[in-house]
Each structure stands twice: as structure tokens, then as C-alpha cells.
Regions:
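Alpha-helical, coiled-coil/dimerization segments enriched in small aliphatic residues
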Residues: 39-45, 172-208
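Ligand-binding pocket segment of bilobal, Venus flytrap-like solute-binding proteins
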Residues: 196, 203-231
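A short, structured surface patch at a secondary-structure boundary
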Residues: 13-74, 78-87
């Protein structure tokens, strides 16, 4: 039995709609019983405490179809809707439909600085002190990261890959990451590296994410670094298969010097990580 005098984690009888909202509340160690996400691959692995009900796109098509029966079945106290300002992917747009059905709704605005949103999340649950504690810890981590960043040689060439694992099929799908993606921008801006995947005519169903195709064009640019994000094992398997078929690329700087790194997947909803 847990210590009743330790206030966190708080497991609330609520449903959270929106990946960023779930992330900010999770940073405060406040969790719900249900989650509707859709922006972050494999969100169910990042938030195992919350039952995944559907994706945000499906929710916006009909806000009450899945959420309303779930809320009534679990007797949810209220629903937290993320307000992100998006014209076509904004969970807060479902507020009116839910309130018409008698479901209590609270809004968490995730626009603005990370510190500002953490304070909003803390205020929503009466946990202002916890929010300030998390902000202090984050500031300390960023200061430590700044020391690391200063030690990295600028201008290194990087090949960046993403593997997304399907929770249904248990299969992984590997992609290239282009300079358009938030993940690439975070890595290149933070560490002053260059993403060498530049294919302006490549099809992108999701901005910044491209089909793997033949990797020769990447390895011919002799990358200094190879970065695996998401399911790193799946990324490694694909690049290893390619190098076995094209052994000349084993001499590229990244492979020869063992400069192959795993990094978390990143998009705006994961700013806190």
C-alpha cells in the first residue's frame, strides 16, 4: 500500500484529450484514467497509466461517440481538453458538443512558453507549488544540457531516422527525417549539426517524415553522426541491412567511428522531454 501522505502521483478520475495536455499534466505527475491522443507515435508507451480511447482526429469527427460512453462508464469527474490554437487539430473544439451532453469540461491552454503552460496546468489542479518545483528542476537540466552543447563540434553532418512501432501489429516502420520536421529542427538548433537528408521533391504525408527508399544518397554524403529516434533497434536493423549490401559505406565517418546515437522522438507535444 502506498504512503497516503505522499501527494504524487495524483491519479485523477478524468479523461485527457490532447498529447501536449497529457504531457504537461504528466510532468506534474498528474494522470487521468483515459487519454485521447494522436500527435505522438506510440503515445501508449509514454502514458501506460491512461487507457487510450481513440485518436484526436476521430474525436474531432464526433466528440461524443467514444468519449461520452467512456466518461459515463468510469463516472469521470470531468474532461480536460487541450487548447492549442490549431485551426484543424484542436481538441478544445469539442467543448460545446460535450457540454451539451452534460459532461463537465476544463480547458488547458498549451500555447506559450513551457513555464507558462506548467503554471496553467498547476493552477487547474491546485498544484501551483508542484509546478514551480518542476520548473526549477527543468531549468537545472537545461543548464546541464547547455554545458554538453558547448562541448560539441559545430557543423557535423547527421543522418536522422525515425522508427514508429505499431501497438496493434507489433511491427516497426522506419523513415528518414527531413529538415522540415520539428525533430530535425530541435537537433540542428540545439547542437548546431546539419541534417543531410535534403530531398525537396520527396513525398511527405506527415511534414518532415519521408519514406526510407535507397539510402545511398545519404551515405554518399559521409555523415559524421547517425541518429536513431523512436524504435532505435528497428532503425539499426535497416541501416545494418543496407551496409551489408553496400559494404563500401562501412567506411563513412559515423559507422567507422561508431558515432551512432539513440534519441527520443520529438514534436511540439513532447517539449518537456
Amino acid at each position: 500500500m502506498g504512503n497516503p501522505f505522499i501527494p504524487f502521483p495524483r491519479c485523477e478520475n478524468i479523461i485527457i484529450v490532447g498529447d501536449a495536455a497529457a504531457e504537461y499534466l504528466g510532468a506534474l505527475r498528474i494522470y487521468g484514467r483515459g487519454l485521447i491522443g494522436g500527435d505522438v507515435p506510440s503515445m501508449e508507451l509514454l502514458h501506460p497509466m491512461e487507457k487510450h480511447l481513440e485518436c484526436v482526429s476521430c474525436f474531432l469527427n464526433d466528440p461524443t461517440q467514444v468519449l461520452m460512453p467512456a466518461a459515463r462508464r468510469m463516472k469521470a469527474n470531468f474532461v480536460v481538453l487541450e487548447e492549442n490554437g490549431s485551426a484543424d487539430f484542436n481538441p478544445a473544439a469539442g467543448r460545446e458538443a460535450l457540454e451539451k451532453e452534460g459532461i463537465s469540461v476544463k480547458i488547458l491552454d498549451v500555447r506559450g512558453s513551457t513555464e507558462l503552460v506548467l503554471r496553467r496546468a498547476g493552477k487547474l489542479f491546485g498544484e501551483e507549488k508542484q509546478a514551480e518545483r518542476i520548473i526549477r528542476e527543468r531549468t537545472e537540466r537545461l543548464a546541464a544540457l547547455d554545458d554538453v552543447r558547448k562541448s560539441i563540434r559545430k557543423g557535423q553532418k547527421a543522418a536522422i531516422f525515425l522508427a514508429i512501432r505499431s501497438p496493434v501489429r507489433h511491427e516497426s516502420y522506419v523513415f528518414r527525417i527531413s529538415e522540415r520536421s520539428a525533430l530535425s529542427q530541435l537537433l540542428t538548433n540545439t547542437f548546431a549539426i546539419e541534417n543531410i537528408n535534403v530531398r525537396p521533391n520527396a513525398e511527405e504525408r506527415i511534414p518532415g517524415i519521408q519514406e526510407l527508399d535507397d539510402l545511398s544518397d545519404l551515405f554518399e554524403k559521409n555523415p559524421d553522426l547517425i541518429v536513431y529516434t523512436g524504435d532505435a533497434a528497428a532503425c539499426g536493423q535497416k541501416t545494418a541491412e543496407f551496409i551489408r549490401k553496400h559494404p563500401q559505406f562501412a567506411e563513412c565517418n559515423a559507422v567507422k567511428n561508431g558515432r551512432i546515437y539513440g534519441a527520443p522522438y520529438y514534436c511540439h507535444a513532447l517539449d518537456l522531454r
